[in-house]
Amino acid sequence: MAYEKLAVQDKAVLEGILAEKKRQQANIELIASENFVSEAVMEAQGSVLTNKYAEGYPGKRYYGGCEHVDVVEDIARDRVKEIFGAEYANVQPHSGAQANMAVYHTILEPGDTVLGMNLSHGGHLTHGSPVNFSGILYNFVEYGVTKDTQVIDYEDVRQKALEHKPKLIVAGASAYPREIDFSKFREIADEVGAYFMVDMAHIAGLVAVGEHQSPVPYADFVTSTTHKTLRGPRGGLILASKEWEQKLNKSVFPGIQGGPLMHVIAAKAVAFGEVLQPEFKDYAKQIKLNAKALAEVLIAEGVEIVSGGTDNHLLLLNVKSLGLTGKVAEHALDEVGITTNKNTIPYDTESPFVTSGIRIGTPAVTSRGFKEEDMKEVGAIIAAVLKNPEDEAVKADAKDRVKALTDKHPLYA
């Protein structure tokens, strides 16, 4: 992408952009919530649509001159409904957090009881964390994973639902490496008369092409981000049945947002168009193959993986078993060009600023073209560094091996 105007007008900002571009090219990106969008998506997001205010919805705007952005928003809505087989879609949420907020705003009153997954067990801030609006406004009761299997205990979810009678049950996670059984959650919700919402932000790209059970047939509401495994711009969306259209639309605008970001919605439309292409199914399948290949090597190297493996795009490593903290492990890997994030693990005794684990995912490296053999090499590098975080010879060798992989799979070549 050329930056002729920026090079003349604002070299300081351009330097930051180019430095980040260089970092993305030189590093192996394993943050599970990140991905690399196509250049077409970036072009749409950097278009003249950034100039247009468009409060309201297609055909019902509060501003004139919206006839063209109406077309773009309709394309985005139609495509995402086709992808997931949904009756209704709202593509205006600026983020997944705001998509969740809009659903809560639609069906809950402050103080209502909600059942959500514990953040340290793999949930999300917006699923009831006490430092988040969700935990402040609503009475969240937490469920989690068992100590022995480290997977969701559906009977425990059921017992908590029977005891607390929540108005809403939330499923979905930000650091859970196993497939979630949405049909079981639906049964529990029906048993206690609760609404059921799924936040599929992390797995949406897998769901889109049948690589994970779809929540759409089971949930009253489905929310997602549009980046991560969907490989679109940063943003959010909501899916539901047609009956909720008016209430959900009002909750998004004017309920929690003003004007939509039309340039981002255009980028969402482009990304959704890419998801509808046959190549995307191959991509999603490769994400899982890469995650499994990475897990196999790490397990063979003696690195403990939460739940013993993965069914999706991410792995959660318990680095405490190697005598490290997540903070130390993240820094050690970053030094050799592998980007991860420290992450709490179930029943963690460390603070969220230190943690006992790191989270790694394969969406971004898969977008670069990494295959199973590449991931085996990545796994070997990770294991070597985590076992010898202070060994300069090991780190020098790791840097060379990382460079060989990033040179083999250039970004935006």
From Swiss-Prot:
InterPro entries: PyrdxlP-dep_Trfase, PyrdxlP-dep_Trfase_major, PyrdxlP-dep_Trfase_small, Ser_HO-MeTrfase, Ser_HO-MeTrfase-like, Ser_HO-MeTrfase_PLP_BS, SHMT-like_dom. It comes from the Bacteria. It catalyses: (6R)-5,10-methylene-5,6,7,8-tetrahydrofolate + glycine + H2O = (6S)-5,6,7,8-tetrahydrofolate + L-serine. (6S)-5,6,7,8-tetrahydrofolate binds at L119, G123, H124, L125, S351, P352, F353. The keyword Lyase does not apply. CDD domains: SHMT. PROSITE patterns: SHMT (PS00096). Its EC number is 2.1.2.1. It is found in: Cytoplasm. The modification N6-(pyridoxal phosphate)lysine is found at K228. Its cofactor is pyridoxal 5'-phosphate. One of its GO terms (molecular function) is glycine hydroxymethyltransferase activity. GO terms for cellular component: cytosol. Gene3D superfamilies: Aspartate Aminotransferase, domain 1, Type I PLP-dependent aspartate aminotransferase-like (Major domain). Belongs to the SHMT family. Homodimer. HAMAP family: SHMT. This is Serine hydroxymethyltransferase. It comes from Lysinibacillus sphaericus (strain C3-41). The gene is glyA.
